[in-house]
């Protein structure tokens, strides 16, 4: 066999080997970064990953995901954002205001899909319809939602007068909307008890402070810090006999009393669609910020029973009551 024949055969053999096939797949794969002030699980599939799979993006095949979560330490997020930028992802997905702002400060060129409150008030984008720059995403803000949760609380506990709420001090969006929240409480003759914290380790003390302040209920915000610690919050609130009113269905699924917010599966599909469009060449600045249009009320009856609360028929008729 001459040299040309040998190297030709060797090349064909190598191209057909599983090692080269895997290398080709890795070369073709797109890389996305995920950034959160909370915890990003690799073991929990979730509706976002399912939606991505339906769109043809499968982690480990044509998609590489770089996850960076601060585990409730919001001050660590900027460094994690810089770390993500250094691996040169095709896109960065951010969860919450803290992560969105950190990613914006870290890069002006890598596309960012930000899940946040009002991205205009946060300074992430110039407008909802024409974001411009390298950022688009999903706004969890719907002006009526905060009031709606308080209305549900009033329906559930007509005698309630004082309500606790834990706030992540690093979440700049909170300070943008604080006056709106205070007006919402006042409109229903409720007195808020806000407790600001900077790390997840402070959650137990914050709940104790709210309980000692004779609160009738606890509002649980949708910030990543609280989502990542939802089971702990459920357990501690129950120990203090505090009914919890939360933002997303994973909260009552973790043992909290109830939630009212965007339908999780629908939101995940829309966010995955935005990611898909960018991975296929769309410019983030040309993609309007999307907002939820479908909402759900979810109740955990086991928690209601443990709190000796009777859920009014009016709420039961509007809610999905979890089994068990």
Predicted regions and their residues:
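Short hydrophobic alpha-helices and adjacent helix-cap/hinge residues
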Residues: 1-324
């Amino acid at each position: 066999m001459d040299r040309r024949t040998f190297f030709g055969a060797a090349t064909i053999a190598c191209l057909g080997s599983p090692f080269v096939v895997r290398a080709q797949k890795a070369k073709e794969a797109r890389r996305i970064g995920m950034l959160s002030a909370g915890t990003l699980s690799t073991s929990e599939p979730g509706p976002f990953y399912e939606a991505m799979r339906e769109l043809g993006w499968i982690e480990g095949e044509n998609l590489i995901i770089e996850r960076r979560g601060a585990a409730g330490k919001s001050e660590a997020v900027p460094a994690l954002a810089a770390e993500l930028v250094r691996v040169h992802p095709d896109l960065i997905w951010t969860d919450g205001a803290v992560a969105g702002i950190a990613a914006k400060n870290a890069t002006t060129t890598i596309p960012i899909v930000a899940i946040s409150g009002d991205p205009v008030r946060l300074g992430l984008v110039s407008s909802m319809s024409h974001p411009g720059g390298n950022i688009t995403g999903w706004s969890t803000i719907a002006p009526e939602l905060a009031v709606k949760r308080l209305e549900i609380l009033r329906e559930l506990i007509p005698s309630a007068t004082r309500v606790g709420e834990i706030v992540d001090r690093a979440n700049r969006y909170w300070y943008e909307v604080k006056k709106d929240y205070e007006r919402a409480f006042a409109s229903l003759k409720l007195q808020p008890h806000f407790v600001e914290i900077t790390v997840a380790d402070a959650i137990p003390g914050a709940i104790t402070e709210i309980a000692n302040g004779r609160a009738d209920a606890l509002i649980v915000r949708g910030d990543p810090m609280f989502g990542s610690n939802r089971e702990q919050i459920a357990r501690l609130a129950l120990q203090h006999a505090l009914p919890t009113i939360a933002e997303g269905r994973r909260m009552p699924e973790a043992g909290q009393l109830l939630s009212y917010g965007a339908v999780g599966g629908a939101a995940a599909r829309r966010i995955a669609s935005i990611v898909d469009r960018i991975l296929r060449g769309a410019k983030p600045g040309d993609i309007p910020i999307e907002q939820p249009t479908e909402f759900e009320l979810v109740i955990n009856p086991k928690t209601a029973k443990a709190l000796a609360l009777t859920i009014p028929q009016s709420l039961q008729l509007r809610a999905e009551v979890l089994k068990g």
